């Protein structure tokens, strides 16, 4: 079960959802709670907030530390990075961040996953697709969640 969501701030802090009761109930029912981190800021996904974090090793370290603190403090089993609308110029920085995050969390026994919009070609245009390196993320993280709901709402 994945409470939605921890939101990034421009200073790499996390705004927590009210998840304590849900985590308690999940664990009591032998269900693994997974933390979800998004780059939602104010009214929607923020390309700028994420870009600022990816441009700063210090902010990345702070974010990784904050994620780890929440994982251990609330007994989550891992994290799902639901990061959307990444600027194309941040593609490699995001891959490098995922590598650092995954290495650190694996050392502590946590799993890492990412959420990706499905696409029909490797060079599909659009901010939702261009900066995500699907092959690299497949190598870096433990699991990938395909957000098929991006193709329509029913």
Feature map (PLM): residue ranges:
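Chitinase-like catalytic core of GlcNAc-active glycosidases
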Residues: 7-154
């Amino acid at each position: 079960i994945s409470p939605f969501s921890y939101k990034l701030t421009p200073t790499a802090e996390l705004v927590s959802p009210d998840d304590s009761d849900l985590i308690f109930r999940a664990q009591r029912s032998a269900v693994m709670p997974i933390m979800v981190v998004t780059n939602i800021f104010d009214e929607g996904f923020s390309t700028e907030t994420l870009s600022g974090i990816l441009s700063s090793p210090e902010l990345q370290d702070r974010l990784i530390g904050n994620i780890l603190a929440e994982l251990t403090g609330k007994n989550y089993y891992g994290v799902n990075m639901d990061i959307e609308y990444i600027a194309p110029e941040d593609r490699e920085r995001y891959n490098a961040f995922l590598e650092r995050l995954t290495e650190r969390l694996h050392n502590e026994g946590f799993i890492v996953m990412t959420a990706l919009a499905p696409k029909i070609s490797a060079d599909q245009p659009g901010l939702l697709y261009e900066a995500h390196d699907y092959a690299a993320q497949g190598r870096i993280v433990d699991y990938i969640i395909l957000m098929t709901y991006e193709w329509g709402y029913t």
